Amino acid sequence: MSITLSDSAAARVNSFLANRGKGFGLRLGVRTSGCSGMAYVLEFVDEPAAEDTVFEDKGVKVVIDGKSLQFLDGTQLDFVKEGLNEGFKFTNPNVKDECGCGESFNV
């Protein structure tokens, strides 16, 4: 099982954590949403729960709850700039289908 980050994603997360002044790492999860069923959730976490799984890549701790892990195993998190837009991009090998707007996915 693994979660990986690109260099740009790791730099961005570390920058956010430094500006925030505290935090254990980044929580990555899924929630029911959109036309394809699931959407990604990113939030800072100050302390992982006992049932969480913690991955570390490039100095960033990524925390995932047990329910989300089955849908996220093998995911790579990247931070990309496209024109005037920038944001996190997920490359998830478990995704079978995505909605047209790119906001949700199905596994």
From Swiss-Prot:
Highest taxon above the source species: Bacteria
Cofactor list: Fe cation
GO CC annotation: cytosol
Chain residues that bind Fe cation: 35, 99, 101
Sample GO molecular function, one term: 2 iron, 2 sulfur cluster binding
Cofactor note: Binds 2 iron ions per dimer. The dimer may bind additional iron ions.
BP-aspect Gene Ontology terms: iron-sulfur cluster assembly
InterPro entries reported for this sequence: Fe-S_cluster_asmbl/transfer, FeS_biogenesis, FeS_cluster_insertion, FeS_cluster_insertion_CS, HesB-like_dom_sf, IscA_proteobacteria
Matching Gene3D superfamilies: HesB-like domain
Keywords noted in UniProt: Iron, Metal-binding
Pfam families xrefs: Fe-S_biosyn
Signal peptide: none
UniProt family annotation: Belongs to the HesB/IscA family.
Described purpose of this protein according to its UniProt entry: Is able to transfer iron-sulfur clusters to apo-ferredoxin. Multiple cycles of [2Fe2S] cluster formation and transfer are observed, suggesting that IscA acts catalytically. Recruits intracellular free iron so as to provide iron for the assembly of transient iron-sulfur cluster in IscU in the presence of IscS, L-cysteine and the thioredoxin reductase system TrxA/TrxB.
Name this polypeptide is given: Iron-binding protein IscA
Record organism: Klebsiella pneumoniae (strain 342)
